[in-house]
Structure formats: C-alpha cells, structure tokens
Amino acid sequence: MTVAEQQPQHQGYANPGTPGSVVTFKKRYDNFIGGQWVPPVKGQYFDNASPVDGKVFTQAARSTAEDVELALDAAHRAAPAWGRTSVTERSNILLKIADRMEQNLEMLAVAETWDNGKPVRETLAADLPLAIDHFRYFAGCIRAQEGGLSQIDDSTVAYHFHEPLGVVGQIIPWNFPLLMGVWKLAPALAAGNAVVLKPAEQTPASIMVLMELIADLLPEGVVNVVNGFGLEAGKPLASSPRIAKIAFTGETNTGRLIMGYAADNLIPVTLELGGKSPNIFFDDVMMEDDAFLDKAVEGMVMFALNQGEVCTCPSRALIQESIYDRFMERAVQRVEAITMGHPLDPGTMIGAQASTEQLDKILSYLDIGRAEGAEVLTGGERGQREGLEEGFYVKPTIFKGHNKMRIFQEEIFGPVLAAATFKDEAEALELANDTLYGLGAGLWTRDISRAYRMGRGIQAGRVWTNCYHVYPAHAAFGGYKQSGIGRENHRMMLDHYQQTKNLLVSYSPNKMGFF
C-alpha cells in the first residue's frame, strides 16, 4: 500500500481513554517529587496535544525554579541512603522495574505513541524492549563492577572505590521520551545517584505514566520528575549549584547553553546533540541481487524510522555514481511502499511528527530544498489522512542534490533524505566528514577491508557497518565534533555517574623521616 492509497479506517489499539483502550491518561499531571504527586508551586499547567490528531488530551505542570528546588530537596534527602544501598539491592530494584515495564509493555507503548506520534509497532518492537533491556543491562553491570587495589610497596596500598556523584540533573528529548529517559536513569540509579529529571515539554505525559507504574519500587526521592518549559524549568535545573552533574539530549544550540551552566558550577556534563549522519553505499552492494542488497536498500530507507526524528537519522545518502540510478530506483520504490496511517494501527510504518512546531520546521525545509534546486524524487509534501487532518504528518521525502546545500548540512529532524553521488572511496570520505556533526554514520560494502578503512576514517562516534539504527545497551553511543560530549550506554556509562575515591593507606609504623 502506498502513502496515496491509505484508507481512513484503522484496525489496532483503541485511542487512550476510549472503550477497550489499554491506557487512560489523567486529565492533569502534577510533578513527581519525593514519591508524591506535587502540584506546581505557581499552580500553572500547560496543554499537551497528541500529534496523532492534534487534540489536547492532558495537561502537565508548568514548573518553575521553585518546583525544581522542591525536587532537589527531595533528591538530596534521598541521595545519602540510596548511595549507601548495596549494589545487590540497587540491581534488584532495576530488575523489578524492568519486569514491571515488561508486564505492562502494551500500555507503555500506546502511551508513548499517543504522546509522541510514532507508530505503535516501533514502540512495541523497539523503544520499550530496548528500555527494558537497558535496566537489566545496568543491573548486571553494577553487580559486576569492581574497585581497584594497587600495592605501592610492602606496607602501602592504594584502594580505589567507585562512589556516586550524589544528585544529578537530566533533561531528555521528545523523540524517544521513554527510551531516552531510561538511557539516563538506568546508569545513574545503578551508580547510586538520586535524579531530578525534566522531560521535553512536547512529550510530558508518557514518562509520567511510567512513574505511576514504578513509583512503589523506588525509595522516595530517588527519582523526581519535573515538567515544564526549557527556560522556566530546564535552565533552573541545569544551572543549579545543587546538582553534581547534568546530562542533556537535544539540539546543539541548547547544548552550548547547558555546557555554559555546567562550567559556571564546575560540574561534569554529558551532551548528546545533533547530527547529519552520512549513509554510504559502495558499488559492490549491487554485485548480487540477494538478501544483502535488500538489507542495504532498507538501510537507506531507515531515514524514515521514527519519522526521521532521530539524532543519528541517516539523512545524507552518499551513493557511488556507478550504481546510483539502479540503487535509487529500488530505494524510491521502497519509500513509496511505506504505509502512513494511524499510529495505533500495527500496520502503520510511519506516524506523526512530535509537534506542530516540528511539522512546520520540516515543511519549511521542503521549501528550502526546492529553492536550492534540489530534485524531489518522492514525497515533498504534508501527509493527509481522513479523520486525522489536524495530525502532524509528512510524506517521506528524498531529494537529489549536492553536499553544500542546506538540506545536506542542517539538521531537519524529519523524514527527509538528501542524496548525492561520489566517485571513489576518497571522495566518499571527504563528503562524509564535510559536516559540523559527528554522531553517527552508516557504511555499506561487501569489502571488509574497505569497511574498516572507512569506519576508522569517518569522524563519528558510531559507524554502523552493514546495518543501521541498532541500539544495544552494551555499545557505547556518543558524538564527535558538535554532536556532543561523553557517551551513553555501555558499562563505561557508570563512570560518568561516579567519582573515584582513593584511599592511600600506610600500614607501616615508621615515620617518613622528613621532619
């Protein structure tokens, strides 16, 4: 079924709050502070509309600095005891959270889809299973983590202990609200920290559904969630002298501000920022008409996953010129077969953009691409569906152009692919690295030696080789250049939420002899 052939009806999950639905949102969400639901100090709330139909379905607390202070109070009360809790107990709590989420997977998946707009087939098969696995992974990591001992001499020993930072701040994005929340919560909690977390104002609801679900599993104050807008709630959190670390995922310009706040307080920062990821296809992918070629075509179409709202979206396709026409013909056919429909229909392959602001931004870049002279190969317009006319939909779009165009250089964060050709390996590497960003990249070839050379040469924190958009818990993720600082995932993430205590102990009764 093509985008143009959609039928208005859908067979899938019932809309939240309707008969048969697996989830019902509250009419209004307060902040989650100290294990309690606490109204915002100033009594203000903001409307939250679903991208699916553009209609308001709940309200969230419009928090201010006063609410952030209440959350920090609760976190500081909880942090000492939580930090002293045995790694076994912390690990077991994370495992219980994972089990609870798994038992309620459909409820969380539908909540995430309604809040964000992404297809429920993605939340069911990717977002939630990955989030669950991240809790289990870090539950295992903290049990396996060991300190160190160095024998300086026969009577002097250096002991090294991992200690939590204390209270940390976390600000998560709107493209994967639950998964990005878990990416930050799991290692921070495993390491023994208390957390104050601020969700994106575009998606404030699904994380609150999660907190309702797991609140009884956590000691009061260990996790605190404060909703609100960036300047009103995010800035007071990021700039607070009462946090020992700030972790942020979002756009690069905001990341610069966050880093400035952290510098003022001399605290560590983890930033996962923007990207303009190249996806490179060498001519040997078409040597055979086989499963690998089919996989490579799918790899190019991955730009449409999550409606293109992924920091590592493979938004630049670089295709060796000798195969461009043949390869692109297959890719366009695959894109035009994408099913756009109701996000709660398991058959829907692409859903709604997360907000009306993001919709407008994407549509503006479609105009920019045309104005630059790029050729529209497919898509290029807003998606329309009967019954969801007010939803935030965009048809997956492929432009053909060159790497100096704005659509190749600026992060669009939508289902928009900019494709260009290259002659040889050297040009492919030059084009791939001709960007301010360096978060991710894709590489497709049957030549493993070339794959290694290119993978080492590409300036990006992750280079997917003959795959794309795979996010296992035990693979480090983070950016080069203006795509960020620090890493997410992998056991090394524990180090980002801990500090090393060295006890240098002399067992000798004898003085040193200097005085």
Swiss-Prot record:
Molecular function terms from GO: aldehyde dehydrogenase (NAD+) activity
Domain of life: Bacteria
Comp. bias (Polar residues): 1-12
Reaction(s) catalysed by this chain's protein: an aldehyde + NAD(+) + H2O = a carboxylate + NADH + 2 H(+)
InterPro entries for the chain: Ald_DH/histidinol_DH, Ald_DH_C, Ald_DH_CS_CYS, Ald_DH_CS_GLU, Ald_DH_N, Aldehyde_DH_dom
Keyword NAD: yes
Keyword Acyltransferase annotated: no
CDD domains for the chain: ALDH_ACDHII-AcoD
Listed name of the protein: Aldehyde dehydrogenase
Gene source species: Deinococcus radiodurans (strain ATCC 13939 / DSM 20539 / JCM 16871 / CCUG 27074 / LMG 4051 / NBRC 15346 / NCIMB 9279 / VKM B-1422 / R1)
Protein's gene: aldA
